[in-house]
Swiss-Prot record:
Gene3D superfamilies xref list: 1.20.5.300
Top-level taxonomic group: Bacteria
HAMAP family in alphabetical order: SlyX (MF_00715)
Family: Belongs to the SlyX family.
Gene that encodes the chain: slyX
Family matches, as InterPro entries: SlyX
UniProt-listed Pfam families: SlyX
Name of the protein described by the UniProt record: Protein SlyX homolog
Organism: Aliivibrio salmonicida (strain LFI1238) (Vibrio salmonicida (strain LFI1238))
């Protein structure tokens, strides 16, 4: 009977170690996910800025495709 108790104690100890490792892994994954979300949010802000800049660009200084001279290989 004492052997059974020792085996159960070893199994419980092993499960506690696994649980602690999993908790640490979950915390690390949560931190990584939070950092990625911040990066995504920052990139969305930057993208909106770039799109806004492109929309306000003066396209009148650009030539139409029909006015462009063809490349030399034509």
């Amino acid at each position: 009977m004492t052997t059974d108790i020792k085996q159960l104690e070893l199994k419980i100890s092993d499960l506690e170690c696994q649980m602690a490792f999993q908790e640490q892994t979950i915390d690390e994954l949560n931190d990584a996910l939070s950092q990625q979300q911040l990066l995504i949010t920052n990139m969305q802000v930057q993208m909106k800025f770039v799109v806004g800049k492109m929309k306000t660009m003066d396209t009148s200084s650009m030539a139409d495709a029909s006015e462009e001279t063809p490349p030399p290989h034509y």
